[in-house]
């Protein structure tokens, strides 16, 4: 599990070795589409990206986020994972975490969905994630993937997931497809997300398997289950009681 060295340790990224179908197109399929990391200075980071295995999907651009403005760069990694690097431009924007190092923690995960209203209702009813209004917005990497004009707009909503952490929903075009996988492997790209919560048994969800107990790592002896969401996305839940 990767976490920020000098920044927040509350949210991290788990790296899993996986086989990827040769025809996988990460931005043309339903499921977990990308993660967003909060950063300090995008212009400085670009020089490092240019000499790394990561590839830029679109030029840097500025856009609105909540009540402020952000600078955004989308990149793709060697596992076909899409990552958005976000620099906050407004000093008075308080809804996003403040980066404590050059590249800090994930603060948002994006889900590509068939129907945004159905997905919002699912996460509200099952995990009590509050619903937020939909807006129409340009999403350049998505338009590029489908060879649409970049001024094409899509329905999206940003839903508060936790403290300064968001679940963003994108309603994808009709010609999007299910995300295929190689038998015995996880879905390629961003394969799933993990959520910790105090009590799993209180939820009305259909588990893929019976709950198991984690045998090692940071959540040793904690209960764990997985389920599929409204668009077939994989979600892992870990029962973990935070100590005061």
Regions found by a protein language model. Give the residues of each.
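Eukaryotic phosphotyrosine signaling hubs
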Residues: 30-34, 106-107, 188-190
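Vicinal oxygen chelate
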Residues: 11-14, 36-37, 43-102, 111, ...
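Amphipathic alpha-helical segments
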Residues: 45-52, 115-131
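Short consensus segments that form the blades of beta-propeller domains
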Residues: 25-27, 99-100, 183-185
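Post-signal peptide N-terminal segment of secreted/secretory-pathway proteins
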Residues: 1-2, 21-29, 40
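Hydrophobic, helix-prone linear segments
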Residues: 1-13, 20
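Conserved donor-binding loop and adjoining core beta-sheet/short helix segment
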Residues: 17-21, 33
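Low-complexity, glycine/alanine/valine/leucine- and proline-rich hydrophobic stretches
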Residues: 174, 184-195
């Amino acid at each position: 599990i990767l976490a920020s060295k000098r920044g927040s340790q509350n949210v991290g990224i788990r790296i899993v070795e996986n086989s990827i179908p040769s025809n996988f197109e990460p931005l043309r399929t339903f499921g977990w589409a990308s993660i967003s990391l909060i950063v300090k200075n995008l212009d400085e980071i670009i020089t490092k990206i240019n000499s790394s295995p990561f590839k830029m999907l679109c030029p840097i651009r500025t856009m609105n986020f909540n009540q402020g403005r952000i600078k955004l760069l989308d990149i793709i990694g060697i596992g076909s994972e899409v990552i958005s690097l976000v620099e906050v431009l407004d000093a008075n924007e308080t809804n996003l975490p403040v980066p404590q190092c050059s590249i800090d923690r994930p603060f948002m995960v994006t889900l590509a969905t068939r129907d945004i209203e159905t997905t919002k209702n699912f996460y509200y009813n099952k995990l009590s994630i509050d619903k937020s209004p939909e807006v129409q917005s340009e999403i350049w990497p998505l338009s590029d993937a489908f060879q649409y004009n970049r001024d094409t707009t899509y329905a999206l909503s940003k839903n508060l997931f936790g403290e300064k952490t968001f679940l963003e929903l994108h309603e994808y075009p009709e010609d999007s497809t299910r995300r295929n996988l190689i038998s015995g492997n996880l879905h390629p790209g961003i394969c799933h997300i993990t959520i910790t919560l105090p009590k799993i048994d209180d939820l009305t969800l259909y588990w893929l398997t019976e709950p198991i107990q984690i045998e090692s790592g940071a959540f040793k002896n904690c209960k764990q289950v997985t389920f599929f969401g409204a668009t077939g996305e994989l979600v892992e839940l870990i029962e973990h009681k935070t100590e005061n």
